């Protein structure tokens, strides 16, 4: 690899990730130091009460509408301080599916509409429904698995009056310095490994292997199956381009196009999620825990997409 390639494919993206992680860590520490978690948790209070979840989970849920990194950092800090158990951390991370989805919703709308036209509303609506299903499912799981929070104690662990800005900044900076070195030491080599595997064609080969062994897609027409293939071996927009061409040419009905896109989304995302999310997840959580969270998220995501797609297949 030349220096130019190393800079553009590894060094510069890694610097951006570490910069985002650093900013998110500072923001999360500052919010907690100022006791703003009390305010943020109020927006999701009915849901976290129903799910027997702690106040910091509600604060993280609200924060995830603006920054997924800051939301996860908030959960990691609470877990390290013993305020969240392993089980609560996993449920809290999965609970943030809906706000995390909303972070990407504008981009999804602006990308899908030019290709799919009115069919984009069905596709986006189905993926939104799947995200809502995931968060509501976690609320139900929390209600069954977690012990009830005493009435009136969603915010009771936080003091009424927070520290001054000077005190909060000092506390945030002190905690930031303790964690940032560890984050860099973990994130940098993992990101470098992901770039190396990608440059060696590992992920492309894995996606091609999956695409070549999709015998269960016999129920799809060859044209619809091509949408799935393009979405897997290339990028999401390649699948959209194929779908748009077939849709506007009258080659496929809307329903089959949408189902093909859903299937391509379901099959291609796990590998890409691991490739893109693991480096910064491992910087926020322990690497083993980071891998576990990504697996849980992808399993839940696949299950919710499958439920929504089956509902559309039989009822749409």
Which positions does each model-derived feature cover?
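Membrane-water interface at transmembrane helix exits
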Residues: 28-32, 76, 113, 142, ...
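Membrane-cytosol interface motif
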Residues: 47-56
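Long, highly hydrophobic alpha-helical transmembrane signal-anchor segments
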Residues: 1-37, 100-123, 217-238
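Juxtamembrane and boundary regions of transmembrane helices in multi-pass small-molecule transporters
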Residues: 5, 17-29, 40-43, 80-81, ...
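Hydrophobic transmembrane alpha-helices of multi-pass solute/ion transporters
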Residues: 1-19, 42-47, 141-181, 208-218
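Transmembrane helical segments that form the transport core of multi-pass membrane transport proteins
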Residues: 32-44, 173, 177-251
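Membrane-interfacial helix-loop connectors
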Residues: 63-94, 108-125, 207-285
């Amino acid at each position: 690899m030349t220096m130019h390639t190393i800079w553009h494919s590894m060094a510069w993206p890694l610097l951006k990730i570490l910069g985002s992680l650093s900013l998110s860590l500072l923001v999360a520490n500052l919010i907690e130091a100022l006791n703003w978690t009390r305010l943020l948790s109020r927006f999701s209070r009915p849901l976290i009460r129903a799910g027997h979840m702690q106040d910091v989970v509600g604060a993280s849920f609200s924060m995830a509408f603006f920054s997924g990194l800051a939301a996860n950092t908030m959960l990691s800090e609470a877990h390290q301080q013993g305020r969240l158990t392993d089980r609560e951390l996993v449920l809290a991370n999965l609970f943030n599916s809906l706000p995390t989805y909303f972070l990407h919703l504008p981009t999804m709308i602006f990308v899908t509409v030019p290709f799919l036209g009115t069919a984009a509303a069905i596709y986006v609506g189905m993926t939104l429904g799947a995200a809502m299903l995931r968060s509501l499912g976690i609320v139900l799981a929390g209600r069954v698995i977690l012990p009830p929070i005493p009435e009136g104690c969603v915010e009771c662990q936080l003091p009424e009056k927070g520290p001054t800005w000077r005190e909060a900044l000092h506390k945030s900076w002190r905690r930031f310095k303790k964690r940032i070195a560890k984050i860099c030491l973990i994130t940098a080599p993992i990101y470098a490994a992901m770039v190396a595997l990608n440059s060696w064609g590992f992920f492309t080969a894995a996606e091609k292997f999956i695409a070549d062994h999709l015998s269960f897609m016999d129920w799809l027409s060859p044209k619809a199956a091509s949408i799935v293939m393009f979405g897997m071996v290339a990028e999401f927009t390649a699948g959209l381009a194929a779908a748009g061409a077939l849709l506007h040419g009258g080659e496929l009905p809307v329903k089959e196009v949408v189902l093909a896109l859903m299937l391509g989304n379901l099959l291609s995302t796990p590998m890409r999620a691991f490739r893109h999310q693991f480096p910064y997840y491992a910087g926020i959580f322990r690497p083993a825990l980071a891998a576990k969270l990504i697996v849980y998220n992808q399993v839940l995501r696949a299950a919710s997409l499958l439920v929504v797609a089956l509902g559309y297949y039989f009822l749409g």
